[in-house]
């Protein structure tokens, strides 16, 4: 969730298609000197910079105080990182310039009787603040300062490519959450797992699940598409591991579009999570080094120690720029609040070593033309796995870790690999239109951990296995943003994507070697899902029209055609032969929205949008009896979701708030019914589904050094699995309980900041009472603490996760307490300490 001092319009907004782009700097613009001189109307404050470029600013006032935050700036002064002067001019009591945050310089101006006014301009020396006051002196009356014209001194305008074009956040007719670099770094002190960071900060998204996948983390009760710089990460039927495809250190900002959208294509029934990688620097050279350690505080067990290293290097040589980030993270083992080792499952993050490389190369051919190539590689390895999970008795209420050392042979160790290649070209004015073209390729490989048990859901297999999935995706986008005159524009274009999906096998393992020696040895393969091609072609157009100062309309459509092709017959695990074939589908989807400004501080929006996704073909092909591509058309039809949403946004001097309500419905939902008893087979139910909910956000700067805020997120949902008009609750895997977060921050000293943050997850037993869930979900609360202090030339950060050492099971883990997978009911970590130090040079 965004902080008030970093946002302009409001912290949550959007439209029915979205990616977010905003000019941002990997490090700050350096302020190397400060000059202050008295003028006829007050003072002129010169902040000397090497670039002379005016940064984005945010203003607020209280009492007789004016605060101006300069975003993406850093003080680099020989006299230290604070400048202050008392009574510099009549009517001005004090002036103070401080490094408020790692990327924010704050100018604080205090008047004697009135709030000073200030205009920010650029000069050859740097940034000039012309400060004046309405106070009059006896010798010479000061001229009355002119108030800024409407729009002249607006706060920062975060832009959202809601229609794949840049827009002011307050102009978007839907809910969007923007997570900036500072917030990402803040949460990364507690976890390097992106899914848990999103769970802490995004309304409508499931709470942190402490796993390497987003199971139990839907967005408004449905699956979200995840993009990296516009490259889609989710292929048809893929395991939800996409948040492991990039490290937080490689991210500049994240835009989350809440609710179905189709402008970026399919797989976005719940919305879009667009991850924007680190942006080029404006300095000739910048670098940041970070190291950190962590451990469980219960007993500082040796196995619990974690470590991380990060390095960022950026160059900018006129028309050429280069950005490189490297990060390494070793999680160690986890221990719960009772001092027990957390039971390791296939999805837990213990003993995980992660590497991430991001390289970005850009060339500006002219002021209007730019070519950029991005390479991102991520690798997860789980090593030294000397414990396995085992179901415990009901009294303990959790799975337990059982010692059992495993050694892997011949490429059988669990891992996740992902590679992204992305080429972008931009022409800002080609025949009157802004043109953007993109080509991308992605390769993903995943091998699961070997469980010390037999798979019970697939009786025909009858042996111990682990699974492998390997798929590739390539595609491209071409779009043009054309002005229509009269404050209106149209974005139009074409997308194409080809997925080499499926290709999943179970590795048959040597049972005797596993049981007697703990050796994981592959002795054969069992095909689970055949390789199939899934191609998509989309045409779209989106119109924006500002009717007047109060009313703005938007609307558009997308026509999508896709083809499923299974080239060879396939024998699935239940003994059925799936006949080869090809099937073509098409969908046309619409969106319509309006924004109305009730006043300068308050606006409202309403929208209708549609999203769609093909069902996970693997869930159909791998377990369905007597299935044929051409004959079972209804089972593989795309799921189309309609959503209606209304909302209010408010932006005052020191408060940002939002409130939205939504209802979405799909006539042909795709709900995987998981068996509750061993030996049963999962099935995919294609039936009507509905989801509804309310979301609220608040950020309040109480006074100069204190800030509070939080989010409230509640949703519910039902499915008519038998299509008889009798709806039953959706499972907790799809509908997460009430989520409430809150934070309190204090700037204790100019170089010292402290934060407490609370996560409360409510109970949910509605699905359990109607025999949908195998366990009720009990509520829990987690309190975290973070302290950041300037130390030497760098910054020291100390974080304590689960400060009160609360013993609990995450919601997704509680849902496994009963049923056929009780060994997956792992507890959360107890109190855990992290310490890291970063240095920019």
Put a short name on every predicted segment.
Residues 22-151:
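Signal-peptide-cleaved, periplasmic/extracellular N-terminal interaction regions immediately downstream
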Residues 290, 548-549, 562, 661-666, ...:
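Gram-negative outer-membrane beta-barrel transporters
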Residues 424-426, 433-452, 597, 603-609, ...:
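Membrane-embedded beta-barrel scaffold of Gram-negative outer-membrane proteins
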Residues 612, 760-767, 788-841:
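C-terminal beta-signal and adjacent terminal beta-strands/loops
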Residues 300-331, 336-385, 417-429, 484-485, ...:
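Transmembrane beta-barrel wall of Gram-negative outer-membrane proteins
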Residues 246-290:
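A beta-strand signature from Gram-negative outer-membrane beta-barrel systems
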Residues 207, 215-216, 231-258, 309-311:
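Short acidic/polar hinge/loop motifs at secondary-structure boundaries
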